[in-house]
UniProtKB/Swiss-Prot annotation:
InterPro entries in the record: Acetolactate_synth/TF_NikR_C, ACT-like_dom_sf, Arc_rbn_hlx_hlx, CopG, CopG/NikR_regulator, Ni_resp_reg_NikR, Nickel_NikR_proteobac, Ribbon_hlx_hlx
Molecular function in Gene Ontology: DNA binding; DNA-binding transcription factor activity; nickel cation binding
Record note on quaternary structure: Homotetramer.
Cross-referenced CDD domains: RHH_NikR_HicB-like
Protein name listed in UniProt: Nickel-responsive regulator
Pfam families named among the record's database cross-references: NikR_C, RHH_1
Residues given in the record as Ni(2+) binding sites: H77, H88, H90, C96
Keyword list, A-Z: DNA-binding, Metal-binding, Nickel, Repressor, Transcription, Transcription regulation
Length: 132
């Protein structure tokens, strides 16, 4: 591990200290390491450098919408090679929450997630991508 020195303006340091307290970091170093990891991960995603990933796709949908449940199930089966696991939750009489764990090439995971989120009556779709 290397020790470095940085200069941060007072307002930014105050905001960082608030975040450290709220999130319960033991020290500033660990908080800055996490921020650096997150920034590097985001940059590699934007630049297309991340070859393989694990993705967490979460979305809600109206299960009573005509054939939607069947379409979503077929989509998962059609991509069985990247769909590792799914959790299904009944939110109320009409709405369900699906959380899917995906593992593959980053482009394939994004394509799958985009396809699911584009279905009519699928709402609040979010994909979190983690590097492998």
């Amino acid at each position: 591990m290397q020790r470095i020195t940085i200069t941060i303006d007072d307002d930014l340091m105050a905001a960082l200290d608030r975040m450290i307290e709220i999130k319960g970091y033991q020290n500033r170093s660990e908080a800055l390491r996490d921020l650096a990891r997150t920034g590097l991960q985001q940059a590699s995603l934007e630049e297309g450098q991340m070859e393989a990933c694990v993705g967490v796709l979460s979305y809600t949908y109206d299960h009573s919408a005509r054939d939607l449940s069947k379409k979503l199930t077929n989509t998962h089966h059609d991509h069985h090679n990247i769909s590792v696991a799914s959790m299904h939750v009944h939110l109320d009489h009409d709405r369900c929450l699906e959380v899917s764990i995906l593992k593959s090439k980053t482009d394939d995971v994004r394509h799958f997630a985009d396809h699911v989120k584009a279905e009519r009556h699928v709402t609040h779709g979010t994909l979190a991508v983690l590097p492998l």
